[in-house]
């Protein structure tokens, strides 16, 4: 699921994003592009590699990693709903074992997770992932640009969190008085329950990590027919109504 998702292709494995950052760095240098990296390029940025122009490291594993599992699940605190990377992320204490070059240590890590998954769950599934899902998503799905980036002034980028909050489905907006019966979060639509035989699947279901939304271009150029169909089905499922 994740392998096909837009989260996987958030970084320099996305040709449109790659060209945008290459052009930005050609014009204004590497420092302003860090504004984008805090949400798009964790493997590059958090390893201190963004001082070097991305043209020189496009083919590195870090540049091709996208947003991995730990990009979301290693976050330990959400600062606010102001967006623009408003989160605190920590190096997972169990990661040294799972990423070890020693196959015995990696095997021991996997065995321990299956025997006693509690520490793994506590490390990677914080209460806010479930209880404050929209606030968690706002850390990267609410964006602005400011003078250090555009040499102009503060301007709003996209803002999916406030749009959700002001809508009827959130249970927090003025239109919520007539629908729905139960408020919906980001995950209600973008991480629907799907069947799975994963050992962690409650009642045989997990939250989909395809993150279907509006981007049909990525699965099309990636020749990923399954992901493309999932996104098309999502867009055709009466997701939006317009009040006139």
PLM features per residue range, with description:
Residues 3-27, 51-244:
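Primarily the internal scaffold of c-type cytochrome electron-transfer domains
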């Amino acid at each position: 699921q994740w392998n096909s998702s837009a989260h996987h292709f958030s970084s320099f494995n996305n040709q449109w994003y790659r060209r945008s950052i290459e052009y930005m760095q050609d014009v204004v240098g590497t420092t302003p592009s860090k504004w984008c990296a805090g949400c798009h390029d964790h493997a590059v940025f958090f390893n201190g590699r963004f001082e070097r122009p991305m043209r020189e490291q496009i083919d590195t594993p870090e540049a091709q990693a996208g947003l991995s599992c730990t990009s979301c699940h290693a976050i330990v605190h959400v600062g606010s709903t102001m967006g623009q990377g408003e989160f605190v992320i920590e190096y997972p204490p169990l990661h040294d074992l799972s990423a070890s070059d020693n196959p015995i240590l990696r095997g021991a890590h996997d065995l321990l997770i299956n025997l006693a998954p509690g520490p793994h769950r506590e490390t990677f599934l914080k209460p806010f992932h479930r209880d404050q899902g929209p606030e968690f998503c706002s850390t990267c799905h609410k964006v602005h640009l400011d003078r250090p980036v555009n040499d102009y002034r503060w301007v709003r980028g996209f803002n999916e969190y406030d749009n959700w909050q002001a809508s009827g489905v959130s249970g927090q907006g003025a239109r919520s008085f007539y629908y729905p019966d139960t408020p919906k979060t980001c995950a209600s639509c973008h991480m629907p329950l799907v069947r799975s035989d994963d050992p962690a699947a409650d009642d045989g279901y997990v939250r989909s990590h395809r993150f279907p939304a509006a981007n049909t271009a990525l699965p099309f150029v990636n020749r990923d027919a399954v992901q493309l169909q999932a996104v098309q089905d999502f867009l055709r499922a009466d997701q939006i109504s317009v009040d006139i």
